[in-house]
């Protein structure tokens, strides 16, 4: 897989001047971009759409975010998601359904809540046969939650499995959870689940990963825990290792770093009067250079 097909980056209209973001994206040379669109902003989609239109020559994945109101009313989720697809379908045919579905702060109190939303995908697929839908959207390595979204007797069908495969709590991508599972093994397990799934085509997209930075509160929630936060040079090293490990497995179609501008875990610090490119910015740029192997 060509490296520009593999490497992706999350961007947001909420941090930084849009024109500056365009320039940063161009400097990096990244072609795949992820933009979050919250369901609770469905009446104010114009700013998100105008932002996305700045990148119409890129390959955009829209991540539709859920909240409790939309989880509690699947019909509302269906209508809102349809409106978002209608708004963005001139720019992209790729949509990720939900985000961190195994964390209650995003509205799903259990996996069944999310399965109720995925049931709407039967209708979405009928309405939009040309759209590629990614789902599962489990954060961290919780294979039982992933399993429930990929093996069941529901009727929905996904085009790709999205995984928010953070490993920062272990430190390095080579560190092992439970003494067994480093990043490569986690990917192999998720890929095996995807390959056997009866609800999903055999594609694995890692749609979020980052390493939070030390001493950057309030921009990262866990700055007080050195075990899961790193200095800027270490972040750049782990970023490089993560993308290289994931690509070398041959089991992942793409990986997106979340996100471009954020002082707590991004590639660029926007505090102060100017945008400061951190070591991870240059590490990400090197990934995309033809000389990188």
Q: Where would I find each of the regions flagged by the language model?
A:
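Non-catalytic accessory regions flanking glycosidase/transglycosidase catalytic cores in CAZymes
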Residues: 1-94, 103-141, 153-157, 196-205, ...
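A generic structural signal for ordered alpha-helices
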Residues: 2-4, 11, 73, 168, ...
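Flexible loop/turn segments at secondary-structure boundaries
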Residues: 16-18, 41-42, 142-143, 169-170, ...
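Cell-envelope and extracellular/periplasmic
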Residues: 37-38, 99-100, 165-166, 209, ...
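Noncatalytic carbohydrate-binding groove/subsite architecture in carbohydrate-active enzymes
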Residues: 111-242
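Aromatic/acidic polysaccharide-binding cleft in carbohydrate-active enzymes
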Residues: 206-285
